[in-house]
């Protein structure tokens, strides 16, 4: 998997101070996309174990509340295994920190993926420049923010906000 940028101490992509990973590669090609340079899967740099270690180190700061994964498209078949591995490792080391993930897919299309065990918040839906929004953390009004919640018996549900 390639990535475009690792942004430490990001306050724009999720609640609190976060480490943000922008992956490369996206087939959605949304009109008006703010990150068109990330569409090519070979754009940016190859993500390595050293990058994962760097993310883990950055997240050790008490000011950091979690990891945000954006794109490109994190849930594309070419990215999903590495994204799952990153999320699993982060949750193993920092179970109290949240993972936010942006995708052009709808949550119901990807809800059974292994990565969803580790993700706490999903912003889903393709960017649509004809539908401006004032909703936080979304680029267009058709996008949804889903928050994982656990019932008293430990069952997991996704609640739209």
Regions found by a protein language model. Give the residues of each.
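Conserved Radical SAM active-site core
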Residues: 1-7, 17, 35-100, 107-112
